[in-house]
């Protein structure tokens, strides 16, 4: 029975990755068919795309907040930088797949550069001081957008942005981004980042370059926020400073805290729920924000560590339980027949 129970674990690693890839591709094809076949209305389609964008924003902030243990409040600033960088590039390029990829990469790289510039001095501080500095950064970016109308369009906004953010573009980007972050956190670099979260002094005493890894985590967080910003630009087709206020950063932080600090799966679930909830409550238009707030308060009272805490699940774990459970049932049944 021991050999049977090992079922899924005996499958080669490359085959596990292949199974996961096939399942994800099937989900992408199914989702794209639902969106493009008219099975959902325009509002529902918009929410589906927003969910993907906010998943990436929540997962990216989780790198700095959940894995590193810091409290940045300027995530909307990195999102804005990436959004405007990609939008300006897309307005000058023809509509091609390479243009989309270049825009996403440019948005991420520009945001990561700002992450390094802000991270080097800011990450010497902790707690409230870091929150204040990053909050100031987000507001500076918003003010610059307003006061550079020749580049950003100013208060009226940057318009006529090509709408590149289709269902497949958004969710392929989200899946690849989550896979890259997951791979990073399973590497020795990820373990160093987690060590800093648990005890920075002990990590430094163990030989971990805390300054380097704090800036690394911060810049990775900023990079994927910039990519999400680029997706947002390609989704809306217009960017205004009001899209990137302090409340945007707070909303993203709420998703991370609600899902569970340090849980990628929690961030994904919370982002999906909080993005879809306003649409689900539209029948209660007068009270939907009150209901939204009450649900958040009740959840945090009864689940203060978030929906999943620090627990993460994966396709591999789910498949392992399903396969092992099925094999165990068959083995037990066969043993019963033999005994009879």
Predicted regions mapped to residue ranges:
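Membrane-interfacial amphipathic/re-entrant helices at transmembrane-helix boundaries
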Residues: 1-56, 85, 96-103, 339-340
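Cytosolic-side transmembrane-helix boundaries in multi-pass membrane proteins
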Residues: 1-29, 198-200, 205-215, 281-340
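Single transmembrane alpha-helix segments in multi-pass membrane proteins
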Residues: 41-93, 117-130, 200-204, 209-210, ...
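Residue-level recognition of pore/gate-forming positions within transmembrane alpha-helices
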Residues: 54, 83-84, 111, 135-140, ...
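Transmembrane alpha-helical segments in multi-pass inner-membrane proteins
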Residues: 76, 215-302
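Alpha-helical transmembrane segments within multi-pass membrane transporters and channels
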Residues: 93-139, 269-271
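Transmembrane helix-bundle core of multi-pass membrane transporters
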Residues: 132-189, 324-332, 339
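Helix-loop-helix "hairpin" substructures at the membrane interface of multi-pass membrane proteins
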Residues: 166-240
